[in-house]
Every structure is written in structure tokens, then in C-alpha cells.
């Protein structure tokens, strides 16, 4: 979306004052172009349709590509937004999105995306925390930290993804991820990285697992996550402790 700012420029002549208008156009890449209004013959605004698989999403300074897998549209990269905090500190509901980076190194967020506790991922919707359930319980899409028009996948949506790839975790892993019987083929285009996680003891694990939060809680008080393992092709699900720091992958509304 273009944000258009109008400024008035006064040009002084010897015998008269001429007022001319200059239009300043701020583009999505944060560059600005100035155009004299008297040079414009025609001004047309076009809404470019979103096409999953070819369109990209620019969000919080990052550009994400998209992929169609079966009936679903996914971001191909893990989210990487927010302010990095130390792995020794819990993320908090402070109106600022916070993330962990493996080994507290920003370069690892650039490579793998950020890691988020569950409550941070769902943005504390309906009073959700890492120790209490939302009230009322979630119904419908949970945008959380995803861009507008996207949301945190539910358990059911992850299950649909798994069914689409015939329960083959290697089809979800990026090429070059995994070893032995767990080598990624990325035939789905999901491009999962073994980004690891932030553990409940504040330590980090990387290169062995890919963990993704769902928005779905479990009756035990945890939240369901989908995960892939280094050395096998399984697609796994488990109700994890919400204080763990996992990757977040968004799905289109």
C-alpha cells in the first residue's frame, strides 16, 4: 500500500508568487519519490491481486515467500520479527513482540527465524498466558504475531498439511536438512529448517529438530506443536510446555 503525502512548495518570481504542489510518494521499500503535480497526466491506483505461490508478503521489514500445499497457502519461511531478548528471560505481555535467537545471536534469527513462547506467539489473546488458558477459549483464526490476513495454524490445519504430504516429514524439510532416513526432499515446498528450540531450562537446541507452534491447547494445559526430527521422516505432534521457544509458521486465512 502506498502512503501519499502532499507538500506545498512556493516558488517566488520577480513579479508574482506562484504556488505549485509537489506529491511525495512513500513506497513499500521505504524510499520516497517526489513528483510535481503539474507533470501528472493521469493517476491510477491498482490493487494487485494476491496469488499464493508467486506473491510475497512484506511484514515488519522482512519479505516472506508463499507456497501452495494442497488446499492451503503457507509462508515458506519462519517468522522473524520482534526485539531479541536473552534466552534466560521469559517473554512478557508488554506491547512489544519479543523473540529468542539461538545462542542469543541475531545472525541465527536471520538464518532460522525467531523462537517464541506460546503466549507470545498468540499475543496473549483472551488473556492467554503460558500457565493459564484463554477465556473464552479460542474460536476461529488466531492471528497472533502473523501478518494481517494470516494466522497461527491450528492442530487440524497442521494435520491437513501432514495428510497432504502423506505423512512424509522429509517432504516438509528443506533440501540439505536432516541425515540418514531423515534427509529433506522439500517436495512440498514447505522448506522447514531444523531451527531447534529454546528449552525450559533456558538453553538452546539447534540442527536436530524443527518445532512449530499451533494455536490449539491441550487439556493438560500445554499447547500442541508439530515437529520434525533430524534422522527420520516422521511428522510428530505433542502437547508441549508453553514456555518452550518454537518457530512460528503462518497460514493464510
Task: Go through each PLM region and give its residues.
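Short N-terminal segments immediately surrounding and downstream of signal-peptide cleavage
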Residues: 21-35, 55-61
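Sec/Tat signal peptide C-region and signal peptidase I cleavage site
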Residues: 15-19
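Surface-exposed, flexible loop/turn segments at secondary-structure boundaries
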Residues: 12, 31, 82
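Conserved positions within compact, well-structured domain cores
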Residues: 48-253
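A periodicity- and composition-biased signal for non-globular, repetitive helical segments
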Residues: 8-9, 26, 179
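Sec-dependent N-terminal signal peptides
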Residues: 4-13
